[in-house]
Amino acid sequence: MFRNQYDSDVTVWSPQGRLHQVEYAMEAVKLGTATVGLKNKDYAVLVALCKPTSELSDTQRKIIPIDDHLGISIAGLTADARVLSRYLRSECLNYKHSYDTTYPVSRLITNLGNKMQTTTQRYDRRPYGVGLLVAGYDERGPHIYQVTPSATFFNCKANSIGSRSQSARTYLEKNLNKFLDSSKDEIIRHGIRAILGTLPTDEQGKDAGQYDITVAIVGKDQPFTILSNKDSAKHVAIAKENDNDTPRNDDDDDRPSPPEEPAAGPRDPEVLVATEQRP
């Protein structure tokens, strides 16, 4: 994106009613590797593709446990995610200390959105350059939430964020009706198939053990758990065997946009796979 006279400060509106600094922060989410969140009637699953920033570095974790009933997966600036995860942990600990129960997921995400929103209307702050997928379980069942740098959050049935995540969303849209009645293992493998669709063609032929894919699950009688590398590789192998048509779309992915003049008119939110109305 080219700079213009309306993007010098996060509090400056353009004549089209846009906040360009907030939109630039949303572009940072597309720089991170893809991550997928989906759920059935009893479990919520996060699947993240981890890649090192260089050949000399190790991979950074993309799934962060918050509480026994909650965890997040990130795409974007890891440092910003670290600040937000610390805030979420503090909120969960304080709530459990005060009420001796776990923090309701919807209320926690609302408070997180309120915290992130303040950075979009103060001149001395900048928006958080990270997107979150939140998987949680409470008395209302499993939850998948998407939280954007604009402080907007959505209750989803399934979703994907990060680089090339459109391919994963295509898979999720096509198989959405299968998720609700799927088993615990099946919902994990659906997430893995979706994340494999974000890989370039030359990387899709690797053996199952060569993928650095992290899987986490939370649900009924299941605290938030990140699966071991051995268990993740086992699920990847089975998912690849049962899927001979991994979806991908190189022409419609979520890589960072090339430099261009922002189009006139308000910018609509990114289309989600599926959302749920909050009761």
UniProtKB/Swiss-Prot annotation:
The keyword Thylakoid does not apply. It is found in: Cytoplasm; Nucleus. PROSITE patterns: PROTEASOME_ALPHA_1, PROTEASOME_ALPHA_2. The modification Phosphotyrosine is found at Y103. InterPro entries: Ntn_hydrolases_N (IPR029055), Proteasome_alpha (IPR050115), Proteasome_alpha-type (IPR023332), Proteasome_alpha1 (IPR035144), Proteasome_asu_N (IPR000426), Proteasome_sua/b (IPR001353). It comes from the Eukaryota. Residues 235-249 have a biased composition (Basic and acidic residues). Its main location: cytoplasm. Pfam families: Proteasome, Proteasome_A_N. GO terms for cellular component: cytoplasm; cytosol; nucleoplasm; nucleus; proteasome complex; proteasome core complex, alpha-subunit complex. Residues 235-279 are annotated as: Disordered. Keywords: Cytoplasm, Nucleus, Phosphoprotein, Proteasome. GO terms for biological process: determination of adult lifespan; proteasome-mediated ubiquitin-dependent protein catabolic process; ventral furrow formation. The proteasome is a multicatalytic proteinase complex which is characterized by its ability to cleave peptides with Arg, Phe, Tyr, Leu, and Glu adjacent to the leaving group at neutral or slightly basic pH. The proteasome has an ATP-dependent proteolytic activity. Belongs to the peptidase T1A family. The 26S proteasome consists of a 20S proteasome core and two 19S regulatory subunits. The 20S proteasome core is composed of 28 subunits that are arranged in four stacked rings, resulting in a barrel-shaped structure. The two end rings are each formed by seven alpha subunits, and the two central rings are each formed by seven beta subunits. The catalytic chamber with the active sites is on the inside of the barrel. Interacts with PI31. This is Proteasome subunit alpha type-1. It comes from Drosophila melanogaster. The gene is Prosalpha6.
